[in-house]
Amino acid sequence: MDYIGIDIGSTASKVVVKGDHDIHFVLPTGWSSKETCQTIKDRLLEDSVDVLSDDSKVVATGYGRVAVDFADHVITEITCHARGGREMAGDECAIIDVGGQDTKIILVSGGMVQDFQMNDKCSAGTGKFLEIMANRLGVTLQELFDMADKGTVLPISSLCTVFAESEVINYIGEGQKREDIAAGVVDSVANKVAQLAMKKNLPEKVILTGGLSNSTYFTKILSQKLGQTVSPTEHGRLCGCTWCRTP
């Protein structure tokens, strides 16, 4: 039996297979979630995993979960992250999930979702913002973090991605160091995530999921902003599909 978790995010889609096979991969979601689902189905079949077989159980989550028309079950990201948080940190914890489109703060109490908070529609406090700014600076996301770790923060005050990008362009025009601009960019996102999280009474155990959990620098900065330890998760980008699959 294969247990398959599929997380169709706004920018990336993630797949984890456990059971008879041990597979995981990430691919761009692209403009069509349905086409992405077909790509996932075809790729799994290349690895001898037939999602339509009685020997496969598929659970879908994420922004485009309804497009996974071959899923046996569909659950929200809130539910699957709460399940995973309980497994990792116990019945009392908070999960900060920084995705491409949104950021979620999920409080777990007694092993159940107690409350959650999401950012507004602007992408300024999300991974997409960092991706846009990294492209503007001509570096990868990992290189952005590496540069930020060596820089001094230049303030980026705008709450809007478009206006924030204008601030970055102005800094570039002034000849400011890329390391300092990168530090300002990461600091800006950490500020917005922390402000969102501090709207809730966070428990002692806080874990970070999503692609940014792979960055020790971002985890460190966010911990400083919150005044408490934020623990990264291994393979943070895969948490949604790992925690949604059954059993």
Language-model-detected regions and their locations in the chain:
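Glycine-rich phosphate-binding loop plus the immediately following alpha-helix
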Residues: 110-156, 160, 246
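Glycine-rich phosphate-binding loops at beta-strand->alpha-helix junctions
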Residues: 63-64, 202-225, 233-240
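Short beta-strand-loop/turn "lid" adjacent to the catalytic site in phosphate-handling enzymes
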Residues: 21-29, 49-79, 114
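Short glycine-rich, Thr/Ser-proximal phosphate-binding strand/loop in the N-terminal lobe
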Residues: 3-39, 43, 113-123
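Short glycine-aspartate micro-motif
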Residues: 3-7, 57-59, 93-97
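Adenine-nucleotide phosphate-binding core of ATP-dependent small-molecule kinases
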Residues: 164-199
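Conserved phosphate-binding catalytic cores of ATP/NTP-utilizing and phosphoryl-transfer enzymes
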Residues: 64-115, 194, 198, 242-246
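Glycine-rich phosphate-binding/hydrolytic loop that grips phosphoryl groups
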Residues: 127-131, 231-247
